[in-house]
């Protein structure tokens, strides 16, 4: 095992919206180190959000992330030859990480033509408490509720 835990690196706020959350979304969407493409996808999606909702895109984005954040998740714990899915509380940092991961994964799975439209629509849906990423959070919470009996195995 490792001697020391790797320290968390702090991301810089993005130049347009001055938000660390947007920078993290850009990093999450980026493939093969192509940051410019990832930035254009995010900012174009934000422009589409502004056109469709007539609201500030950063507010819609923050509301979407807030709606996707899970409060409980399941971890598999092996006890006496049986595997139990133990519900545990999610730290604030991991809530954001999971929310961004789910948002972008479910945006990629949508049926629209280009990623900017997919992402914009997924963000709008999530801010209205619908869409694949919100359903993922609901499913996670449902599973945690179903396995509440194993909560005493928490560590």
From Swiss-Prot:
A GO molecular function assigned to this protein is:
tRNA binding
The cross-references to Pfam families, in alphabetical order and at most eight, read: Ribosomal_S7
Question: What GO terms describe the biological role, i.e. biological process, of this protein?
Answer: translation
What is annotated about its quaternary structure and interactions? Part of the 30S ribosomal subunit. Contacts proteins S9 and S11.
PANTHER family listed in its UniProt record: RIBOSOMAL PROTEIN S7
Give the similarity note: Belongs to the universal ribosomal protein uS7 family.
What protein name is recorded for this chain? Small ribosomal subunit protein uS7
Source organism per UniProt: Mycoplasma mycoides subsp. mycoides SC (strain CCUG 32753 / NCTC 10114 / PG1)
